Amino acid sequence: MLKPGDIAIVSGARTPFGRYCGKLKDFTAQELGAVAAKGAIERAGIDAKEFDHVVFGNAQQTSGDALYGARHVGLRAGIPIETPALTVNRLCGSGMQSIVSAAQMIQTDEAKIVLAGGMEAMSQAPFVIRGRDGFTLAPGGKLEDSLMVALLDTYCGSYMANTAELYGSEQGITRQMQDEFALRSQQRADAAYKEGRLQEELVPVPLRNHKGEATGESLTEDDHRRPQTTIEGLTKLKPAFGKNGTVTAGNASGIVDGAAAVVVMSLEHGLKRGLKPLGRLCGWGIAGVEPKVMGRGPVPASKIALQKAGLSLDYIDLIEVNEAFAAQYLAVEKELGLDREKVNVNGGAIALGHPLGATGTRLVITLLYELRRRKKKYGLATACIGGGQGIAMVVESMN
């Protein structure tokens, strides 16, 4: 039954996720965001002039013009100059936060139609030397890898991988369990591509050469995937953060570039226009957790979202949990009591990659397309967030 304040996601599209320093390395986050935005707008069948606001998530500003964020996405996508834009940063939850912010704007009558999404150009994270006030006597400052520095939570003194290992150890998650789950992610993603499932949510990115000239080629699929992955190969990988660790390059999410976008409006407005929305927002939840076990964030966030939706896990048909690390996912699965057969059925971030600011939107898009494909009703999307947070969203398929 239609209720006042019901929010619809009318359409969704995302770019393929490009491997680190691969085919998308020279694209800014805003450029990728615009590609996804154009795809979502076209699929919605709405004139770009009708949008009242643009909200895009971005975690790490990597290009020189990154501070213009959502504003440049909107302008590049053909949104009128008069339409304002907002860039949000809830780290790994930024892409989902953009949908929440869009919904809140609509519910408070600040907007009728909002373009929301997330974007990240991780390959463009620069090396930096800190020393704006100059150097005296000693040689120049230390060169930092801004991407690696960002993965260290200085409040708790732990890298993201270490927080996943701690949370995993608390829940009895072994290295073997992590590698087996990582293999599942690769196999599920490979099967999804072979059966043409993931392609439905993608819009190609036209490629260009080092001179900025179009090559005539496009990136049409997620190329971080490793379909030939074996359990033997995963077992041989060394821990990435300490010899006694369990997180490896094979059982952690991939560093990639990409963007995703959705068109959000009130459900009533969408139905009056004769549109066929992908889904309805039933509720969302955001929670804080201990930073040293930041991967636990989806547990309280999912409970809040389910409570707001008036549902229990028993009613959820499909679930998307961001695979920041296999250890983190498995610990969340254990705490929430998730049925793995319902979760990440087309693979997850271990196979596809995790472009920080875009992932939250990607989770929701993937979830809605798969619910429609299977003719199922309810879905839950959730992600952990560096610094000790979690975000979750419950959706209902409208198809």
Language-model features, listed with the residues they occupy:
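Flexible glycine-/small-residue-enriched beta->alpha junction loops
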Residues: 113-166, 170
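Condensing-enzyme catalytic core mediating Claisen C-C bond formation in acyl metabolism
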Residues: 1-27, 229-296, 300, 365-366, ...
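Conserved beta-ketoacyl condensing-enzyme motif
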Residues: 25-114, 118-137, 202-219, 292-293, ...
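Short, well-ordered amphipathic alpha-helical segments that serve as non-catalytic structural scaffolds
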Residues: 30-45, 69-73, 98, 160-167, ...
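N-terminal extracellular/periplasmic Venus flytrap/periplasmic-binding protein-like
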Residues: 13-15, 26-35, 43, 177-267, ...
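Active-site-proximal alpha-helical scaffold in enzymes
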Residues: 89-120, 168-197, 261-268, 333, ...
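Active-site pocket-lining segment
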Residues: 162-165, 201, 211, 282-351
